[in-house]
A protein has these predicted regions:
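Conserved acidic/glycine
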Residues: 46, 82, 86, 104-106, ...
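Short coil/turn segments at beta-strand junctions that form active-site/ligand-binding loops
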Residues: 70-73, 101, 169-172
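Cofactor-binding active-site loop characterized by glycine-rich and histidine/acidic residues
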Residues: 1-98
Length: 242
């Protein structure tokens, strides 16, 4: 709890804290902008763009060395925006050249970043960031490529993942899912990046109605003054209801 990061000491990153009851009770620490091993069940740092790919390929290389081709698989979750970093291109080339057949990348291709709704090229339309589409990049680097299509169709997702597990040609595999950023949340595309509905607003409750209907629960509604303690208590009650 006394640990500070260099960027915080230099003033480049705001590391918030608070004295609300649950924050103190559970000895919480503020989350980073990207998940890191400080967060339970996160084995490697995931950001900035592409950092997690290189770490995951390193894990796949180590697993292949220790356990061989029949050992554990390393599943890599990525988006097309994260693939624009040069370090990712090096990782893709390394994985293919080393024959890391235990590496499976799941690519969430939604074309939306913090400031663009067309990150990569697609068809005859140029990209705002890069002029390839992720399928081309993966194929060019000699990865097996599986197109799942609609990433919100669980049957297609499952079929693609079963297909990936059936491949046995000594190369890494990538599955590309076409998705919509902010799907069914009411804020789509780049506008949903780091954004959400106002605290306990009507738009928020509208967004969670399908969840309430599917599971037969009613999430708590907040009323009154939005003090830090009461807001924290509302979040806690909502988590318990879920």
């Amino acid at each position: 709890r006394r640990r500070l990061r260099l960027e915080a000491l230099l003033g480049f990153r705001r590391t918030p804290t608070q004295s609300t009851p649950f924050f103190r009770r559970f000895k919480c620490a503020a989350l980073d902008g990207h998940p890191t091993p400080m967060t339970p069940f996160v084995p490697v740092a995931t950001g900035a763009s592409g950092v997690g790919d290189t770490s995951a390929v390193g894990l796949a290389l180590a697993a292949m060395d220790v356990f061989g081709p029949q050992g554990p698989r390393i599943h890599i979750l990525e988006g097309e925006g994260g693939m624009t970093a040069g370090r990712v291109h090096e990782a893709l080339a390394t994985a293919a050249t080393a024959g890391l057949s235990n590496a499976i990348m799941h690519l969430d291709w939604n074309q939306a970043s913090i400031d663009s709704d067309r990150v990569t090229a697609e068809g005859d339309k140029p990209g705002d960031y890069v002029q390839w589409d992720p399928r081309e990049l993966l194929y060019m680097n000699d990865w097996n490529l599986i197109e799942a299509g609609d990433g919100s169709d669980f049957k297609r997702v499952l079929a693609a993942q079963k297909a990936a597990l059936s491949l046995d040609n000594g190369q890494p595999t990538a599955i590309v899912y076409r998705t919509t950023k902010g799907w069914k949340y009411g804020i789509e595309g780049r506008g949903s990046h780091g954004a959400g509905h106002a605290f306990c607003s009507e738009a928020f409750y509208t967004a969670v109605e399908p969840f309430e209907a599917a599971f037969g629960v009613k999430l708590p509604r907040f009323e009154g003054e939005k003090t830090p303690d009461r807001v924290e208590a509302a979040y806690w009650e909502t988590l318990l209801a879920m």
